[in-house]
Amino acid sequence: MATAAWLLGRRVASWRMRPPLQSLAGLITQRTNSLLPVDDAVNGLNEEQKQLRQTVAKFLQEHLAPQAQEIDQSNEFKNLREFWKQLGNLGVLGITAPVQYGGSGLGFLENVLVMEEISRVSGAVGLSYGAHSNLCINQIVRNGNETQKEKYLPKLISGEYIGALAMSEPNAGSDVVSMKLKAEKKGDHYVLNGNKFWITNGPDADVLVVYAKTDVTAVPASRGITAFIVEKGMPGFSTSKKLDKLGMRGSNTCELVFEDCEVPAANILGHLGKGVYVLMSGLDLERLVLAGGPLGIMQAVLDHTIPYLHMREAFGQKIGHFQLMQGKMADMYTRLMACRQYVYNVAKACDEGHCTTKDCAGVILYSAECATQVALDGIQCLGGNGYINDFPMGRFLRDAKLYEIGAGTSEVRRLVIGRAFNADFH
């Protein structure tokens, strides 16, 4: 009688001799090179905005899509610098920056659209783009003096430099005002000592906006915070080994270390002791622009799931024809479209000068949680294929989860919204 081990060995050998599953390989190739159409007439975009999406999407399919899965698996974007310069040539790195510094002079809606399309191809590269274009460049645009803008913006906008923002610390995440990084005045410099943690683009950044305590006795503590522009290579500034993250792999993140790091007083961004105003006003726009990330991830889930449901067969028909699968398609699509309308409308309002803290928190709260659910639904639709790494569904889920944590957790966003309503009744 054949033993169980012998039978298992026969089955394994037989399986290994089979040719690759054509439906699986074919679908992966198909999804790499084509996207579902996005109806921007429904989304309320003008012709220039529609063209922007199409141009960016076409560029990304050629220059980023073929690498997206490898970037995630290796946790490394090998040609990051080259790609960044290509984004600079495309004109999207300084999309909200004035033309005089090499920017495109467009609005936050356009920034969201680019963030969405990059995240549609790679959530990790989208996150790095958001940190560069909004957290770094836009902060210098909004708060820098003319000398600072002329010095830093052109190279950040061209892609020669990579930018970052450093706010969080190991024990100061949501409670960011409790930061411990200290900046002590000595002559015409400030000497920084301490560290920052979870810093997106940290290992790669040439220019960083860094928040530090210049007055540890200030009451309230927020009045003692100042923003600085720090350059890679400044003596006393170093980066630790990049972190091995659950998702957003290839968007390099690390700890920043400051050991008697001398930063010129001329590099104060905004005004001494007014860093909290730079921080909080920038945080609203950070949350808005980063909300484009979950939109892109949700669209990517649909890009892969909808065609699969109309190719895979079970019980003699395409599984997309089963009512339960139709329900999932409807749920995923309506979540995406509801999020899009909210994000786009808040972006339009900000472009018109009406930017509210509760809605900037609201757009990323809702879109982030919807993205996680849509990614879970996508995995369920693909069944076993959704759970193997030949398909990118697991990547979408891991990337989506970051947006419930970064730029303020979902819990903090709910507090922000609730407090805004409470303030109306004081």
UniProtKB/Swiss-Prot annotation:
Modified residues (N6-acetyllysine): 58, 78, 241
Complex formation: Homotetramer.
Family listed: Belongs to the acyl-CoA dehydrogenase family.
GO MF annotation terms: 3-methylbutanoyl-CoA dehydrogenase activity; flavin adenine dinucleotide binding; identical protein binding
Transit peptide: 1-32
Protein known as: Isovaleryl-CoA dehydrogenase, mitochondrial
Pathway: Amino-acid degradation; L-leucine degradation; (S)-3-hydroxy-3-methylglutaryl-CoA from 3-isovaleryl-CoA: step 1/3
Binding site for substrate: 174, 222-223, 277, 284-287, 407-408
Binding site for FAD: 165-174, 198-200, 312, 323, 380-384, 409-411
SUPFAM superfamilies per record: Acyl-CoA dehydrogenase C-terminal domain-like, Acyl-CoA dehydrogenase NM domain-like
GO CC list: mitochondrial matrix; mitochondrion
Enzyme class at the top of the EC tree: oxidoreductase
Location of N6-succinyllysine modifications: 58, 78, 318
EC nos: 1.3.8.4, 1.3.8.1
Compartments (UniProt record): Mitochondrion matrix
PROSITE patterns xrefs: ACYL_COA_DH_1, ACYL_COA_DH_2
Active site: 286
Keyword Membrane: no
Metal-binding keyword on record: no
Co-factor(s): FAD
Catalytic activity: 3-methylbutanoyl-CoA + oxidized [electron-transfer flavoprotein] + H(+) = 3-methylbut-2-enoyl-CoA + reduced [electron-transfer flavoprotein]; pentanoyl-CoA + oxidized [electron-transfer flavoprotein] + H(+) = (2E)-pentenoyl-CoA + reduced [electron-transfer flavoprotein]; hexanoyl-CoA + oxidized [electron-transfer flavoprotein] + H(+) = (2E)-hexenoyl-CoA + reduced [electron-transfer flavoprotein]; butanoyl-CoA + oxidized [electron-transfer flavoprotein] + H(+) = (2E)-butenoyl-CoA + reduced [electron-transfer flavoprotein]
GO annotation, biological process: branched-chain amino acid catabolic process; L-leucine catabolic process
Keywords: Acetylation, FAD, Flavoprotein, Mitochondrion, Oxidoreductase, Transit peptide
Origin species: Bos taurus (Bovine)
InterPro entries noted in UniProt: Acyl-CoA_DH_CS, Acyl-CoA_Oxase/DH_mid-dom, Acyl-CoA_Oxase/DH_mid-dom_sf, AcylCo_DH-like_C, AcylCo_DH/oxidase_C, AcylCoA_DH/ox_N, AcylCoA_DH/ox_N_sf, AcylCoA_DH/oxidase_NM_dom_sf
Function (record text): Catalyzes the conversion of isovaleryl-CoA/3-methylbutanoyl-CoA to 3-methylbut-2-enoyl-CoA as an intermediate step in the leucine (Leu) catabolic pathway. To a lesser extent, is also able to catalyze the oxidation of other saturated short-chain acyl-CoA thioesters as pentanoyl-CoA, hexenoyl-CoA and butenoyl-CoA.
Pfam families: Acyl-CoA_dh_1 (PF00441), Acyl-CoA_dh_M (PF02770), Acyl-CoA_dh_N (PF02771)
